[in-house]
């Protein structure tokens, strides 16, 4: 008996991994391969937690110099400066703010959820910002991770009829790089329906297709 897509377990379609949007078979092919973390990723997590604490407490990251984050990472002046760059940017933005907001995009892709670093509502614009602590330059234009977070942030708002535009922002302190991209809300939702949903359905199929590409 041929296996149907109903027999396929729900894979977690991660916003940070765009391979499933480009190559539906990549998720099932990687099933069973353990996730590996790196020191850079763990430091990034520690810096995100430091920034979140400072934003919620209204204090400078310098106040945590000498402390440890995640019981492992010493907060040095250099690491404080990285967090401060992002904290200062967020603090200077007008609007209603939420930090490290859990978002779900499961109405577009089963199991697709994540955490948006900062979500800011101001007039008719919804800003979704992402702190990147690495040295590889990342741009906001057509950034699928941020676009998915944008869909999730909209889901978090009971009535988003007042929102006209989604502003997606990448903040990279170590590169002194801030990049932003604007997309109309209706265009983003259309992308969710016309790109994300079909890609998720193909990923969940019993025999998903493979479309290997450098971007995936």
PLM segments and residue spans:
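Alpha-helix initiation/capping motif
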Residues: 14, 38, 75-76, 139-143, ...
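Accessory terminal regions of nucleic-acid processing enzymes
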Residues: 1, 52, 56, 190, ...
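Metal-dependent nuclease catalytic cores that hydrolyze phosphodiester bonds in DNA/RNA
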Residues: 1-126
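A cyclin-like helical interaction fold
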Residues: 78-92, 186, 191-196, 213-215
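Mg2+/Mn2+-dependent nuclease catalytic core
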Residues: 94-207
